[in-house]
C-alpha cells in the first residue's frame, strides 16, 4: 500500500516540517475549519446582513469564481481547445468578432473540412450565436476568447443568487450563489472549455427568476427580463428554448407579461433568421440542419431515421458519423438513459445528496411540484437524443440549485447541525481539490486526477502530461517566424481527435491547418500560399510528429 503514489505523498518531503503537498492542503483546511466553527454565530449574522444587499452580493458572487480561476493560471493556463466542439465555437466567436454572421466559402475549402464546420455555401460553425457572442466579446475586449467564458461563469453565479431571491429568503439565496461558485466556477468544465453552458444557465436564471416575480408584482421590468432570458436561450440552445416556453406557460405567467416577453424576444428571432440566411442560404434552415444533411452529423433523435451524408466525409467526420450511428436507435435506449445518471452529479456536490430527501414533503404545494415538473420536461426533452452532456440542461442549473437550497432549508428545521455538517463537507470538498490544483504539484495532480470527478478542470491544460500533444505543437509553431501551413496526416488506425482548427479569415491567419490530400493536391495549396512555411503533422504518433513538409 505504501508504494501507491498517493500514500507516498504523505511521507516526509524536503521541507522543515516534513510535509508533502497533501499535508499542507489538509493543514490549511483544518486551520480554516477551526477558525470558522467558533465564529459561526458571527459569520451567520454578517451573512444575513449581506444577503439582503442585492447589488453587493451579485458583484461579489460574479467576481468570486473569476478571481479563484485567475489564481490558478500559473499552473493551469488559459484552456487549450481540444475537441471539435471547441474549435467550432471558437470559429463562431472569431466570425462574430469580424462583425459578420458567416464567412465567404474558401476556394480550396476541401483542405479545411472539419467536424461541426460548414464549408458551403458559406464557411461557418454549425452552432447558434449565443456562446459565440460571449467568445467574440472576450476576443474584442480582452484579445482572449476565454475571457468571455470566465465572465459568463461569473454572471451565472451572480444571477443564480438573483433568481433564488424570488424563491427563498436572502440568506439561503446567498448560500445558493456560493454553491454555484464552487460547483460551476474555477474547477468546472464550463469554466475550462469553449463549449458553453454558462450562457444557457444565465438564460435559465432570468426566466426562472422572472416568473415568480411576475406572479407577485407583474412588473414590466420582470417581463422584459423574461423575454431576454428566452431570447438568450433561443440564441444558445433553440430546442431547449421550446421547453422553457412550455414551462413558462405551465407556471401560469400572466398573458400581458408573456406578450411583453414575446416582443422582447423578436430581435433574437431576427438574428436567428439572419444567421440562417447568411450561413445556409435559407431563412428557415438552421446551420445545424444543413450540417446534418451534408455530413450526417450531428445525429437525429432516437425515434428518427439515421441521417445520411450527402457529401464525402473526412476521416474524422467518418469516425464521428460511425460513432453516432452506433448509439442511435431504440436498441440500447434504456442503457443510455441509465448511463446519464452520472451526469447529474455535475449539478450536485456529493454531500448535498444527503439533504435531498427533505425536499420531498414540499411537493404537496404546486409551486414546488412545478420545479420537479420543469426538471422532468428538460429530462424528457433530452431523453430521446442519443448523446447527453450537462450543458444540454444548463438552463435548469438554477432549478437544481433551488432544490438543494430548499432541501437544506427544510432540513435545518429538523437539525441545524446536519445542515452545518453538509455545508462544511461541501466546502472541504471544494477546498481540497482547489488546493490540489493551486499547489501545482505535478506528481500530485497526476496521481490524484483519476479520483477527481469527471467534470473537473482539465489537468492537462497546464502541460503536465499534454497527452494529445497539442500544447507542444502549438508552442513549436508559435516559435517559428512568419506564416505557417500545417498539413495534417492521420494514420489509418486513428488515435487522435480533430486537429483542423482554422480561424474565420483563413488566408490571413498566422497558422493554417489543412488536411493532407496527397502530394499532388497539397502542391496546389502550397502554391496558393507561397509565403508560408509548410509542415507535415502526424497527430497519431506518440508524441505527435511535426516535421518540415518534404520538398518535391
Residue ranges: model-predicted function:
Residues 55-69, 180, 225-226, 230, ...:
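Transmembrane alpha-helix segments characteristic
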Residues 144-168, 205-210:
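Transmembrane-helix motifs of polytopic, lipid-linked glycan transferases
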Residues 213, 221, 243-274, 413-414:
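Perimembrane helix-loop-helix junctions
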Residues 31-40, 155-157, 247-253, 331-369:
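Hydrophobic, aromatic-rich transmembrane alpha-helices
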Residues 58-62, 160-184, 198-202, 216-225, ...:
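Transmembrane-helix signature of polytopic, membrane-embedded enzymes
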Residues 57-59, 249, 259-266, 371-372, ...:
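Signature aromatic-anchored transmembrane alpha helix within multi-pass, membrane-resident enzymes
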Residues 136-137, 163, 176-181, 205, ...:
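Membrane-interface alpha helices of multi-pass inner-membrane proteins
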Residues 90, 190, 197, 236, ...:
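Hydrophobic/aromatic-rich transmembrane helices and adjacent perimembrane loops
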Amino acid at each position: 500500500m505504501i508504494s501507491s503514489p498517493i500514500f507516498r505523498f504523505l511521507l516526509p518531503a524536503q521541507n522543515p516540517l516534513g510535509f508533502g503537498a497533501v499535508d499542507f492542503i489538509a493543514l490549511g483546511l483544518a486551520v480554516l475549519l477551526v477558525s470558522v466553527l467558533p465564529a459561526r454565530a458571527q459569520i451567520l449574522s454578517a451573512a444575513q446582513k449581506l444577503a439582503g444587499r442585492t447589488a453587493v452580493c451579485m458583484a461579489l458572487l460574479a467576481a468570486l469564481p473569476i478571481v479563484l480561476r485567475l489564481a490558478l493560471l500559473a499552473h493551469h493556463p488559459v484552456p487549450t481547445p481540444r475537441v471539435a466542439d471547441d474549435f467550432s465555437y471558437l470559429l463562431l466567436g472569431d466570425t462574430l468578432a469580424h462583425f459578420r454572421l458567416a464567412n465567404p466559402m474558401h476556394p480550396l475549402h476541401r483542405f479545411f473540412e472539419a467536424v461541426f464546420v460548414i464549408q458551403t455555401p458559406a464557411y461557418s460553425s454549425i452552432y447558434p450565436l449565443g456562446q459565440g457572442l460571449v467568445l467574440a466579446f472576450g476576443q474584442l475586449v480582452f484579445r482572449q476568447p476565454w475571457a468571455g467564458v470566465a465572465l459568463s461563469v461569473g454572471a451565472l453565479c451572480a444571477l443564480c443568487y438573483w433568481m433564488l431571491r424570488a424563491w427563498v429568503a436572502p440568506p439561503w439565496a446567498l448560500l445558493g450563489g456560493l454553491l454555484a461558485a464552487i460547483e460551476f466556477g474555477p474547477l468546472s468544465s464550463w469554466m475550462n472549455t469553449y463549449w458553453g453552458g454558462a450562457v444557457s444557465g444565465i438564460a435559465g436564471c432570468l426566466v426562472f427568476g422572472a416568473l415568480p416575480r411576475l406572479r407577485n408584482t407583474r412588473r414590466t421590468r420582470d417581463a422584459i427580463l423574461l423575454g431576454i432570458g428566452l431570447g438568450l436561450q433561443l440564441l444558445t440552445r433553440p430546442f431547449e428554448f421550446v421547453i422553457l416556453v412550455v414551462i413558462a406557460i405551465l407556471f401560469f405567467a400572466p398573458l400581458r407579461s408573456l406578450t411583453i416577453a414575446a416582443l422582447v424576444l423578436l430581435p433574437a428571432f431576427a438574428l436567428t433568421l439572419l444567421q440562417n440566411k447568411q450561413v445556409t442560404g435559407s431563412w428557415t434552415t438552421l446551420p445545424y440542419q444543413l450540417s446534418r444533411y451534408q455530413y450526417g452529423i450531428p445525429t437525429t433523435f432516437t425515434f428518427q431515421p439515421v441521417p445520411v451524408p450527402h457529401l464525402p466525409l473526412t476521416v474524422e467526420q467518418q469516425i464521428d458519423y460511425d460513432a453516432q450511428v452506433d448509439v442511435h436507435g431504440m436498441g440500447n435506449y434504456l442503457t443510455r438513459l441509465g448511463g446519464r445518471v452520472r451526469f447529474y452529479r455535475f449539478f450536485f456536490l456529493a454531500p448535498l445528496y444527503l439533504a435531498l430527501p427533505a425536499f420531498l414533503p414540499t411537493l404537496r404545494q404546486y409551486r414546488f411540484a412545478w420545479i420537479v415538473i420543469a426538471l422532468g420536461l428538460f429530462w424528457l426533452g433530452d431523453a430521446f437524443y442519443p448523446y447527453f452532456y450537462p450543458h444540454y440542461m444548463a438552463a435548469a442549473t438554477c432549478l437544481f440549485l433551488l432544490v438543494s437550497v430548499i432541501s437544506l432549508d427544510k432540513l435545518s428545521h429538523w437539525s441545524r447541525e446536519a445542515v452545518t455538517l453538509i455545508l462544511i463537507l461541501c466546502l472541504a470538498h471544494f477546498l481540497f481539490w482547489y488546493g490540489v490544483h493551486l499547489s501545482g504539484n505535478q506528481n500530485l495532480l497526476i496521481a490524484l486526477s483519476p479520483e477527481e470527478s469527471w467534470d473537473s478542470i482539465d489537468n492537462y491544460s497546464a502541460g503536465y502530461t499534454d497527452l494529445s500533444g497539442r500544447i507542444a505543437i502549438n508552442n513549436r509553431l508559435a516559435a517559428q517566424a512568419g506564416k505557417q501551413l500545417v498539413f495534417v496526416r492521420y494514420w489509418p488506425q486513428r488515435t487522435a481527435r480533430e486537429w483542423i482548427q482554422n480561424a474565420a479569415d483563413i488566408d490571413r491567419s498566422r497558422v493554417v491547418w489543412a488536411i493532407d490530400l496527397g502530394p499532388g493536391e497539397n502542391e496546389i495549396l502550397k502554391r496558393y500560399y507561397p509565403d508560408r512555411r509548410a509542415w507535415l503533422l502526424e497527430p497519431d504518433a506518440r508524441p505527435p510528429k511535426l516535421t518540415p513538409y518534404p520538398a518535391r
